[in-house]
Amino acid sequence: MKKDLTNSRLDRQNILNNEMAIEEIQNKSGVEGIVWNNKLFVTREMTAKFFDVDVRTISRYLEQNGEELSENGYEVLRGKNLKSFLDAARNSGKDINVPTKTTVLGVFDFRAFLNMAMLLSESEKARALRQLMLDIVIDLINRKTGGGTKYINQRDKDFLFSSLQ
């Protein structure tokens, strides 16, 4: 199996745990949502529209990866939280197409939104966002290490031994 973000939970989590990378990705990606509790949130419908997939596709991924997405910021709003979120949406001027009688609403914070991008294999936009994420993470690593990273030549079985001589 090819190792990439769509099938490696560990690799996904490594990126999602990097707060500097998340902030940089949010600044460069141009994702628009609703700012609520000082965080950017998007609904399932907004997520589906961004990735050019059906809402049922997002729902299917939520069923299959609900635990992972919840750990990374997906939540179902009810009661006072829902009312507060809907007020924030109205104040932002964004129409999120939520009926007035809605009692629950699933929302992704930006981290969970990126997690969904890493899971979605059907979307070209998700693939492009994954590439942007990897480019930003590699760039941050390069900046933190002073410019470049060194790789061990894994093809040469005697490399480690000879480098210690």
PLM regions: where:
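Residues in the recognition helix of alpha-helical DNA-binding motifs
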Residues: 61, 65
